[in-house]
Amino acid sequence: LNYDPLTRYIRRGTWFISESTDMELAYILTKADMPGFQTIGVNSHVFTNAGATIVQEMAFALAIGAEYLDKLTDTDLSIDEILPKMRFNVAVGQNYFMEMAKMRAYRILWANIAKAYGAKEENAKMLIHAFNAQINMSLYDSYVNMLRTTTGSMSAILGGVHSFSVTPFDMVYEPSTEFAERIARNQQLILKEESHFDKVADPAAGSYYIENLTDSLVKAAWDLFLQIQEEGGYLAALRKGTIQKMVKENAAKRLNNVATRREIILGTNQFPNFTETMKSNPEAWVFEANSRRDENAEIDTIETYRVAQQFEQLRYATDVYSQNNKRPVAWMLTYGNLAMLKARANFASNFFACAGFEVVDNAGFKTVEDGIAAAKEVKPEIVVICSSDEEYGEGNALKIYEALKDKAIVVLAGNPEGTADVLKAAGMEYFIHVKSNVLETLQDFQKKLGITK
């Protein structure tokens, strides 16, 4: 039945009816004679999809579980009557070994909590239903989602969940199609019938790496759980805003990591499909965080989102613009050292393709003058200078900039010491390199080109 007013509270900021009435219903559902039914849910996936770390997700889920135990054991229910009626609904991401260790650590910690309440050994087992997290799934190059859901499924199963649902690859941007649902079913069947993932209990046991990861998660999540308990428990921490603050801070950090490509979303902020364009018109919610906050919310709430959304919005704006206008071209002006020009042209091509610009690479011009002449003939919106630092510093980059600055946006691939200062003094604005904030830089290019959301 998955009745979970405590998780609803952090999403909506309100109760179904009131705290006392909601908890009374939890008591009624737990006491009801429904063999085989888990009536009380702990939906930790909310924290996962809101940007929490694995440690935060675990600690907050355990705090919710402990809150239910505290309130229900204050009634005439025993701990051994309560535990079989509880189920944890957990989202699994793409950090393969860490997610595997997460499931193992969850079971250890919940067993410790249950035993502290005096539960029998057989009732101290955590019942986990897992499914794929949506936070890492993407709109563009969406078939990559199949790979994400497959590796996530493997992590969860090898980590020892009781049941698992594969999320259809298109679920994050449209009502799932028959094809996507069929693929999701077949992913599960392949893992069971062909790969025999259901035949071995705890296959990760004994692996030093996974055991060490598990122990690290157990310690870190337990420490944070105790911190929440010291504040008075889950509800008290919510009312103080402690939990929301931690989740939002990590969500902001993660979005920045995606913007600067410290975190890679394949097909979105790195290695995009250069030729893909959005032919349909996704609804606005696809690009927005999902807030379920009620108008009369009593506390701060959290939103779920996907880390790819800002890049997708950027690229979709280019696709929409290109329906009635020429698609902007990022043109590589390559010369000099062959290895360096190729490396920097590849970097720049991936960089600009993330915004949906048409990318044109070149094999390498014999002279700077040849490159300038070709650029004037092609008339691209963006010219990217690609060569080695040494060949930038021979006055070549400055010559290119001076020749083309009034005809295109001129960009340098790299940030060469000394030469960059000379170019900046001459008026060049854009230098793209591994430390660039890719998202903000591409947004600036769109503004200059008149592309709006």
For each predicted feature, which ranges?
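Mobile "lid/hinge" segments at catalytic clefts and subdomain interfaces of large enzymes
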Residues: 36-69, 147-225
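Flexible, glycine/charged-enriched surface loops at secondary-structure junctions
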Residues: 74-85, 116-126, 194-204, 230-241, ...
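Gly/Pro-rich turn-and-neighbor structural signature
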Residues: 57-136, 140-144, 226
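Short glycine/threonine-rich loop-to-helix capping motif typified by GTGT followed
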Residues: 52-58, 93-105, 133-146, 174-184, ...
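ATP-dependent carboxylate/acyl-activation modules
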Residues: 284-360, 373, 420, 424-426, ...
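Intrinsic disorder at enzyme termini
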Residues: 162, 223-328
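Catalytic alpha/beta active-site cores
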Residues: 1-91, 129, 163, 167, ...
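A glycine-rich phosphate-binding loop feature that marks nucleotide/adenosyl-phosphate handling sites
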Residues: 4-8, 43-49, 82-93, 125-135, ...
